[in-house]
C-alpha cells in the first residue's frame, strides 16, 4: 500500500480495508495472535498455499464457508468449486448464454407437454442459469455480513461455469461451441484464470482432495 501509486486518501482507504480483512482472518480463526516478550506474533492455524493470496474481496468468506462442506461427500470437489465461483465476478455473456439455452430447452419441453403459450412465458421467467449451493451460500453470507460489516459492500453470485465444464467434460473450445459464445472467448478466458487463482492460491491444501487437485491441474 505504501509503495503504490495511489493518492493519500486512497491509501488510507486501502489501509482501513486491509485492517478489516486481517481482523476477519483473526475472527474466523485463520490467524491467531500470541504474545511473547511484550510483542504480538501472528500465526496461521491452517496450512495455506505457498503463494497464498486473497485475490477476491470475498476470499475470506470463501475460507470460512468451506467449513460448511462435508469432505466425505461425493460432490465435495465440485462444491468447493461452486463456493469459489460464487466469490468471482460474473462472466455475464456466458451466464446469459447458459440462461438462453436453459430457456430454449424448457420451451421445447413445455411445447411437447402441451402447455399453452401464456403459461410457457410465465414459467420461463423463473428459469435462469445454474446456481449450485445457492440457498446454503445465501444463508451463510447473510450471517457473515452481520459479523463482518465491510462485506456489505459485496454480494455473492452463485454460478456454474467451471463446475459445468467439469461435469460435462468440456474443454475451452468445446464449451464455447456448446453455448455458441465465440464472441465471449476473452470473457471466459479471464474468468477461468480468476477461478484458477482462487482454487490454487486461496483454498487451503487441507481443504483440497485428490479430485480437486486433478481439476486444478487440468
Question: Model-predicted segments: where are they?
Answer:
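Non-catalytic terminal extensions of ATP-dependent helicases
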Residues: 1-218
